């Protein structure tokens, strides 16, 4: 009876058609995945234990399908690391990598399945090696600070917008004045004042008219004496005083 109790979970799993196998390895090791209790497997699925390590979401996802051409189709995540060891997909070989920890499901045509639980040494929920916690703590501090800064910025913007809305509008600018006009430049002689013109005209009225001045009789006598010598064609000279 004591020997039967430890084997009871395994027996129940075989009866239910969902046998489970546990494997363990390190990155770089090769492990075999086998379908136990599934006669005609059609596909394999994988539910990662730490999906954040691979940038995946939770839940199972298909990783390999049987193909009529003989070469199974492998998901990109396991491409180059997962291959079949027989003509079908009943036995597989996987080259382990960090983050491969999880449960592998072998599904049959009648939806029966087997499970293989794989634990890769070094995989952790935080997906970080020991001694490098500082780099992962930085985003935890930075993200809340960014959130607080965003809230403060939105608050200040709201206050400024409300003040502008409540403040009276500025007065309209004054209309533009007329453009300055410039008088044309005319080169004209300065006009004399009327008073100056009257004085000038008065002086002109007082000036004596033209008259003959008294001539020196001695000169005239000398002229008479010379007239006997000079021919009669000589011109007469008159003196006019203005």
Swiss-Prot record:
It is a single-pass type I membrane protein. GO terms for cellular component: cytosol; endoplasmic reticulum; Golgi apparatus; nucleoplasm; plasma membrane. The modification Phosphotyrosine is found at residue 212. GO terms for biological process: blood coagulation; erythrocyte differentiation; integrin-mediated signaling pathway; megakaryocyte development; megakaryocyte differentiation; negative regulation of signal transduction; platelet formation. Glycans are attached at residues 32, 112. Its main location: membrane. N-glycosylated. May be O-glycosylated. Coiled coil: none annotated. The keyword Nucleotide-binding does not apply. Inhibitory receptor that acts as a critical regulator of hematopoietic lineage differentiation, megakaryocyte function and platelet production. Inhibits platelet aggregation and activation by agonists such as ADP and collagen-related peptide. This regulation of megakaryocate function as well as platelet production ann activation is done through the inhibition (via the 2 ITIM motifs) of the receptors CLEC1B and GP6:FcRgamma signaling. Appears to operate in a calcium-independent manner. Interacts (via ITIM motif) with PTPN6 and PTPN11. Binds to heparin. This is Megakaryocyte and platelet inhibitory receptor G6b. The lineage of its organism: Eukaryota, Metazoa, Chordata, Craniata, Vertebrata. The gene is Mpig6b.
């Amino acid at each position: 009876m004591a020997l039967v109790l430890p084997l009871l979970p395994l027996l129940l799993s075989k009866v239910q058609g969902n046998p489970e196998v546990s494997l363990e390895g390190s990155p770089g090791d090769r492990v075999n995945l086998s379908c136990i209790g599934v006669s005609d497997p059609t596909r394999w699925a994988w539910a990662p234990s730490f999906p954040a390590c691979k940038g995946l979401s939770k839940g199972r996802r298909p990783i390999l399908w049987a193909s009529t051409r003989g070469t199974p189709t492998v998901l990109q995540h396991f491409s180059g690391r997962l291959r079949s060891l027989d003509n079908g997909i009943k036995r597989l070989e996987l080259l382990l990598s960090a983050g491969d920890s999880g449960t592998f499901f072998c599904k049959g045509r009648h939806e029966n399945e087997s499970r293989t639980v794989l634990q890769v040494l070094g995989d952790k929920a935080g997906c970080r090696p020991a001694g490098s916690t500082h780099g992962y703590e930085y985003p935890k501090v930075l993200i809340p600070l960014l959130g607080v800064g965003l809230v403060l910025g939105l608050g200040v913007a709201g206050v400024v917008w409300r003040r502008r809305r409540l403040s009276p509008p500025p007065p309209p600018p004054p209309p533009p004045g007329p453009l300055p006009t410039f008088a044309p430049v005319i080169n004209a002689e300065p006009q004399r004042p009327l008073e100056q013109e009257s004085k000038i005209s008065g002086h002109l009225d007082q000036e004596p008219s033209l008259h003959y001045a008294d001539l020196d009789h001695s000169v005239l006598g000398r002229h008479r004496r010379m007239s006997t010598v000079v021919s009669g064609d000589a011109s007469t000279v008159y003196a006019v005083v203005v």
